[in-house]
């Protein structure tokens, strides 16, 4: 497929499913502003590859004056996966800057191979922040989509006993003046898959052998649970997402703010 057709499809064929919700998130959450330099983090998966193309289109046509870099971290890919990453960058005409780390190996050694996903994610995030800062960027864009957000909400409620969501943007704790943004906050995974298939793209899944062996079991359970609920309630995904926008602190027993715990008794006893 011609690259011009792939690029055009983002704004034309998939305007309703991809471009419009992307623009909605940018405006609603003020994700990209004049003077920003955004590092698009590309793992080689479908989400980050589409994110790179969408932000590329924005950079070409938007009135917002910002700069962009495309960074690709190799956390220890096999030769086959590294080759596929490079092929996808070439196929999509993405000028990605690849840099190497040993994160897969370190995460597996530290956790002794038992569910290293959290450790791996934190290390990858730190490496991306460092590279972005080195390139003079003030923001990192990640490809987390709407389904990632709602699955995170449900994981926290059902497995951690707390209400935490995946925020559309965050300030970095350990990297001064750096922010993380999630422009795909309103985009469904099924629509990203449609674009991937239309574009005839062979994207990477998580290339970690430990994750493959454990199959990210808990998150897959949550994904299946939501799919089952959707059969009876087609709007369940939107309802879960909206719950993070409609928390009524007058109707919760306890909550935290700035690391400090509060209870309803503070107001009740006035």
Predicted regions and their residues:
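ATP-dependent adenylation/nucleotidyltransferase module used to activate substrates
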Residues: 2-155, 159-162, 167, 190-198
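Short, basic, helix/turn surface patches
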Residues: 121-133, 169-175, 226-243
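Short, low-complexity, intrinsically disordered N-terminal peptides in bacterial proteins
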Residues: 1-5, 267-270
């Amino acid at each position: 497929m011609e690259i011009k057709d792939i690029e055009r499809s983002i704004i034309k064929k998939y305007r309703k499913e991809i471009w419009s919700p992307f623009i909605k998130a940018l405006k609603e959450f003020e994700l990209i502003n004049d003077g920003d330099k955004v590092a698009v983090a590309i793992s080689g998966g479908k989400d980050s590859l589409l994110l790179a193309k969408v932000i590329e289109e924005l950079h070409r046509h938007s009135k917002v004056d910002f700069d962009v870099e495309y960074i690709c971290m190799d956390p220890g890919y096999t030769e086959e996966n590294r080759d596929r990453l490079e092929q996808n960058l070439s196929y999509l005409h993405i000028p990605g800057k690849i840099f190497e780390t040993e994160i897969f190996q370190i995460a597996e050694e530290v956790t002794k191979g038992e569910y290293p996903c959290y450790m791996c994610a934190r290390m990858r995030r730190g490496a991306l922040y460092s590279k972005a800062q080195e390139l003079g960027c003030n923001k990192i864009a990640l490809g987390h989509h709407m389904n990632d957000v709602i699955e995170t909400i449900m994981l926290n409620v059902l497995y951690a006993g707390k209400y935490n969501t995946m925020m559309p943007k965050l300030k970095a704790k350990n990297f001064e003046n750096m922010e993380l943004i999630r422009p795909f906050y309103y985009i469904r995974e099924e629509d990203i898959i449609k674009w991937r298939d239309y574009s005839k793209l062979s994207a990477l899944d998580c290339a970690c052998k430990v994750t493959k062996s454990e199959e990210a079991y808990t998150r897959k359970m949550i994904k299946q649970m939501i799919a089952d609920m959707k059969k009876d309630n087609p709007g369940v995904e939107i309802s879960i997402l909206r719950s993070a926008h409609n928390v009524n602190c007058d109707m919760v027993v306890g909550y935290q703010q700035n690391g400090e715990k509060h209870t309803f008794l503070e107001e009740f006893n006035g």
